[in-house]
């Protein structure tokens, strides 16, 4: 954990209470059914904190993001922002949220208008929200923001179009368009997955710098637990629409409780200089779709511990709730946490 992470101020900015998101199946025998993509998700995000949502593709991470940002209607539960219920925000309340909560999506090229220069891309955010002291004031804000996200010389970059920028520069430009509004919360949905490995570290450092200098809270969404370890204060592991483990990032990596988290941790590369070696845990098959969620513990068909314990009936029939194992801040949804220690 970095010094910046350790000094992150406490206090709830965002709270999810039993959030549910459903979609209607579009085809096949289940076409009339509602598919529950997110099912009873609860967590909080503190002011100035970075929380990572980690899980495989299709686990519900993006559905959570879209519900928070009011890009999707939720099917149940509540989303609280600064203590106010924004679950079904409309009108002026929704317009304010569009400024206070910014989303950075994984593909920067799709997020940018190819007809706009870098300057116009960032300035558009100010114009839409009627921010800035005239044309000269907005120009100064845009150029300052471009410099702050590492796009320099700003005067030169400002005149370029998206196709004239590298992948890393495009993602920095997207971040500049978000941060120029001084949001309280930035949701970064797989922000480096489309970038070369050589560019990822720079974007991750940028996010840490923005948190330190501007006090922004970040919800960092990724399928890669090793990236979450680098940037996050806490990690929430998501599987088939549920949080199966949540706790401090260092503790999740050092002592994972849930068998699914253990499998994710087992594939994190270990530096050659360390004497510690991890045995890679292989999971059976692919995660089921949200339309075919197993009864009981939804992870049990792929769970190594379930097989190791002789396939207990409880795993097949009872849905486990998040529960602590010693540390009340580190919880996991497993009937046999003690056996997994």
Kindly give the residue locations of the regions a language model identified.
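Charged, flexible cofactor/metal-binding loops and thiol motifs
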Residues: 9-12, 26-29, 248-341
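Conserved ABC transporter NBD signature motif
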Residues: 77-85
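A short, proline-enriched helix->beta-strand linker immediately N-terminal to the Walker B motif
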Residues: 180-184
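P-loop NTP-binding/switch modules centered on Walker-like glycine-rich loops
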Residues: 56, 195, 199-278
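ABC ATPase NBD coupling module
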Residues: 28-32, 86-102, 128, 135, ...
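Helix-to-loop junction immediately C-terminal to a conserved catalytic motif
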Residues: 69
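Conserved ABC ATPase "signature" region
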Residues: 85, 136-156, 209, 265-266
């Amino acid at each position: 954990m970095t010094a910046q992470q350790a000094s992150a101020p406490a206090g709830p900015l965002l709270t999810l209470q039993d959030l549910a998101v459903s979609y209607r199946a579009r085809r096949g025998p289940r076409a009339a059914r509602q598919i529950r993509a997110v099912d009873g998700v609860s967590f909080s995000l503190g002011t100035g904190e970075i929380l990572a949502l980690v899980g495989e593709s299709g686990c519900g991470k993006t559905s959570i993001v879209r519900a928070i940002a009011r890009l999707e209607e939720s099917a149940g539960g509540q989303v609280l922002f600064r203590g106010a219920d924004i679950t079904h925000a409309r009108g002026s309340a929704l317009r304010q949220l569009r400024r206070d909560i910014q989303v950075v999506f994984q593909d920067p090229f799709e997020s940018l208008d190819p007809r706009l220069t870098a300057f116009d891309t960032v300035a558009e955010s100010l114009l839409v929200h009627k921010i800035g002291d005239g044309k000269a004031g907005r120009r100064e804000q845009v150029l300052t923001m471009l410099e702050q996200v590492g796009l320099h010389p700003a005067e030169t970059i400002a005149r370029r179009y998206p196709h004239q920028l590298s992948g890393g520069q495009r993602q920095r430009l997207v971040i500049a368009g978000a941060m120029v509004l001084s949001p309280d919360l930035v949701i970064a949905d797989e922000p480096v997955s489309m970038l070369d490995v050589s560019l990822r570290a720079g974007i991750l450092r940028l996010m840490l710098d923005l948190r330190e200098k501007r006090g922004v809270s970040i919800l960092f969404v990724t399928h890669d637990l090793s990236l979450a370890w680098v940037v996050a204060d806490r990690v929430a592991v998501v599987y088939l629409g549920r949080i199966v483990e949540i706790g401090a990032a260092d503790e999740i990596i050092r002592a994972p409780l849930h068998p699914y988290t253990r499998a994710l941790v087992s594939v994190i590369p270990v530096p050659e200089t360390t004497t510690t070696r991890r045995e890679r845990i292989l999971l059976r098959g692919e995660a089921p779709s949200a339309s075919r969620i197993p009864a009981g513990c939804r992870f049990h068909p792929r769970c190594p511990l379930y097989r190791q314990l002789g396939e207990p009936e409880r795993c097949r029939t009872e849905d486990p709730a998040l529960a602590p194992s010693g540390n009340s801040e580190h919880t996991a949804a497993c009937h046999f946490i003690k056996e997994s220690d």
